[in-house]
Swiss-Prot record:
It is a multi-pass membrane protein. It is an enzyme of class 7 (translocase). It comes from the Eukaryota. PANTHER family: NADH-UBIQUINONE OXIDOREDUCTASE CHAIN 4L, NADH-UBIQUINONE OXIDOREDUCTASE SUBUNIT ND4L. Keywords: Chloroplast, Membrane, NAD, NADP, Plastid, Plastoquinone, Quinone, Thylakoid, Translocase, Transmembrane, Transmembrane helix, Transport. NDH is composed of at least 16 different subunits, 5 of which are encoded in the nucleus. It catalyses: a plastoquinone + NADH + (n+1) H(+)(in) = a plastoquinol + NAD(+) + n H(+)(out); a plastoquinone + NADPH + (n+1) H(+)(in) = a plastoquinol + NADP(+) + n H(+)(out). This is NAD(P)H-quinone oxidoreductase subunit 4L, chloroplastic.
């Protein structure tokens, strides 16, 4: 596959993630869009690592760390959303102002 095709795919996924993050009102959907953004960045890391084939540019190793951070972010984010849902009975972003209590 050509480099341009992969970069266009990654830019498309990144754009979908940004659009979903801006327009979503549900916390779980916002977390999913954030994961989509992380995955599009990982696609870029792996693509450039394979394209340049340089010993100092190791995007595939860095993408493993990004996957680990994204997994931790998803676990913590879902725990926070679960706690907010137990207390507020809603996962809507505009209804979860925790400072007004």
């Amino acid at each position: 596959m050509m480099l341009e095709h992969i970069l266009v795919l990654s830019a498309y996924l990144f754009s979908i993630g940004i659009y979903g993050l801006i327009t979503s009102r549900n916390m779980v959907r916002a977390l999913m869009c954030l994961e989509l953004i992380f995955n599009s960045v990982n696609i870029n890391f792996v693509t450039f690592s394979g394209f340049f084939d340089n010993r100092q540019l190791r995007g595939d190793i860095f993408s493993v760390f990004v996957f680990a951070i994204a997994a931790a972010e998803a676990a913590i984010g879902l725990a926070i959303v679960s706690s907010i849902y137990r207390n507020r009975k809603s996962t809507r972003i505009n209804q979860s102002n925790l400072l007004n209590k």
